[in-house]
Amino acid sequence: MKFTEALQFIKDFEIEGDLLEIGSDRGDGSTYIFATLAKNLDRKLFSVDVDNDVIDHNREEFDKLPFSLPVEFFNQTGEDFLDENKDLKFSIVLLDNFDWDWNPQSADPDPSIVAQQVKYREQFNLEMTNHQSQFTHLRQAMRLTDMLTDEAMIVCDDTYWAQEYGTYTGKCGAVIPYLEILGFSVVLNKDHGIVLVRKK
């Protein structure tokens, strides 16, 4: 999804917390977009990724900028970061880690997905399956429960409404109902991305 489209939903927000991105930029511009937003809001972006190569690349790209942005990178799982930083509060969260395999039964799988599955298994001891993706995102959402400000926005990438089944699926397919229990409402469902908002 185009992450800039989510920004329209915070115009009337009382931003009391920082920004969190679990799953740093892999070419979609998310970290730069949310770091710029953090600067405009006089807040800070915490960008978390388990892959040290991704973290190193993003640090290098941000170091090249002729100006500074309020972003701090963390090379760990989202769950570990949240467990170690329970004192933080977030008003804007992007959940976009643990990639989704759009065609897991294919006889000719995407080489990039296969390479990532091998890397995650060998380096991080993680089985990169769609079930594990939903499981991981739900665990992160549950840990975030007490770390979210009253007014908050959560962006779920690679997640969509499956009309034929009448339910959400993708990375955050299990997260959406949980967030609705917490008072969030879906305000955007577009291009395999979901935006949820909770207002006072």
Where are these regions (language model features)?
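A short alpha-helical cap/connector motif
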Residues: 1-200
